[in-house]
């Protein structure tokens, strides 16, 4: 969801003819080898000071994410969403606990109606140094509390 339209289209076309039935991808963009581009949209709008405002979701981003999840679902491919990761240059890995809670409650309430969703709390959670063990427990509690459909949940 954080690549250009051509690569996203190619990926979806490739998946359509592949044997895969689950794909993992991140809600937040990654800054990593082969992921150096600037995403077209981010999950949140910015406030007047240029900081992420988790109270103001960027609906273009969320609508696009839902569109991709729907396309995957039509191909009988489940979406394993990675909710946090350490490969960040935009500041999402360093959101305050109350910001993480706002983000998670919005995400789970919005996406849990999709039957083919898996929640991966993090990719390499042990490298997310900004979060304490207690914060990970709280993240798990929030997801379980908000997900009335009880989708699969993992820490990796």
Regions found by a protein language model. Name each.
Residues 1-156:
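Active-site mouth of glycoside hydrolases
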């Amino acid at each position: 969801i954080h690549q250009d339209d051509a690569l996203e289209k190619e990926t979806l076309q490739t998946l359509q003819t592949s044997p895969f039935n689950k794909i993992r991808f991140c809600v937040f963009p990654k800054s990593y080898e082969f992921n150096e581009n600037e995403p077209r949209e981010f999950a949140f709008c910015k406030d007047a000071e240029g900081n992420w405002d988790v109270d103001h979701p960027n609906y273009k981003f969320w609508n696009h994410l839902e569109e991709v999840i729907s396309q995957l679902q039509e191909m009988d491919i489940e979406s394993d969403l990675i909710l946090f990761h350490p490969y960040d240059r935009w500041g999402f890995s360093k959101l305050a606990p109350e910001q993480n809670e706002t983000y998670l409650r919005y995400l789970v309430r919005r996406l849990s109606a999709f039957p083919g969703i898996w929640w991966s709390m993090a990719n390499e959670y042990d490298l997310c140094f900004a979060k304490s063990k207690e914060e990970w427990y709280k993240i798990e509690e929030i997801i379980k509390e908000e997900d009335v459909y009880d989708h699969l949940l993992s820490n990796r």
